[in-house]
UniProtKB/Swiss-Prot annotation:
UniProt organism field: Pelotomaculum thermopropionicum (strain DSM 13744 / JCM 10971 / SI)
InterPro entries for this protein: AceGlu_kinase-like_sf, AcgluKinase_fam, ArgB, Asp/Glu/Uridylate_kinase, Glu/AcGlu_kinase, NAGK-C
The enzyme's E.C. designation: 2.7.2.8
One Gene Ontology CC term in the entry: cytoplasm
Gene Ontology MF terms: acetylglutamate kinase activity; ATP binding
Localization of this protein: Cytoplasm
Similarity field: Belongs to the acetylglutamate kinase family. ArgB subfamily.
Main localization of the protein described in the UniProt heading: cytoplasm
The protein's annotated pathway: Amino-acid biosynthesis; L-arginine biosynthesis; N(2)-acetyl-L-ornithine from L-glutamate: step 2/4
Gene name per UniProt: argB
Catalysed transformations (reactions): N-acetyl-L-glutamate + ATP = N-acetyl-L-glutamyl 5-phosphate + ADP
Protein name: Acetylglutamate kinase
Amino acid sequence: MSTPWEKAAVLVEALPYIKKFYGKTIVIKYGGHAMLDDSLKEAVLTDAVLMKYVGMHPVIVHGGGPEITEMLKRVGKDSRFVGGLRVTDGETMEIVEMVLVGKINKGIVSRINRIGGLAVGLSGKDAGLFQAVKKYRKVRTPEGREETADIGFVGEISRVNPQIVSTVIAEGYIPVIAPVAVGPEGESYNINADYAAGRLAAALGADKLIILTDVEGIMADRSDPGSLISVLRASEVPSLIERGVIDGGMIPKVECCLDALAGGVRTTHILDGRVPHSILLEIFTDKGIGTMVEK
């Protein structure tokens, strides 16, 4: 058990970071195992509430892949992914929107409010927050040819209107956002939550983007637990993707970090959401954790 002196030392260590990030917007992409394990849910959302109480402006963009997959199984539909993105036909899109907006989003809002924060749930369709066009994914065949794959109602964000989020922040609430966008004809699009978080972070002029995932960060060699890449420069990314060091679902996470950096976000981080209070460890301690992706 920590002594009072050890607890005081922790607070003293955090003070410079509380001052540094006071009044700053920090976008958190909430996903992975941290959305499934009840104690981790509590830890992540408690972190967000604490951040708000010390003067920061946390914004949560959540995923929901496992719960979507489970719901699709219930109705007898298989899940298929291309380049880390879910192939989404019309029926699947209805289920995606139902799960993300109707179930997960409201559950997060309810828990934050119970912990002691004040949260407001939004989807990308509210006030035209995320406007999108159909996205096509480039894939490489076993023969090495590059082809374009049709992945259905998966959208690419064409415009972000952050005013509704800024208004919610200004009124003292924590925005919680489901990554569903609206198309030119009013159709719904499934947006990868990593991309949504990156684009929103840039549009808000956020100081930091944090992406929670189910690994320690980006590993140079996944068979070697000691090969964590603590700092990754943008110029190194294409080579790591080509070599397969960055692949699958990690590709959109890294790409969204690069997009956010290009849009003016100061720092981006990929953290292990399985570690309790990983967000606080990154923000309020000298060492930090995970992989920082920088220009």
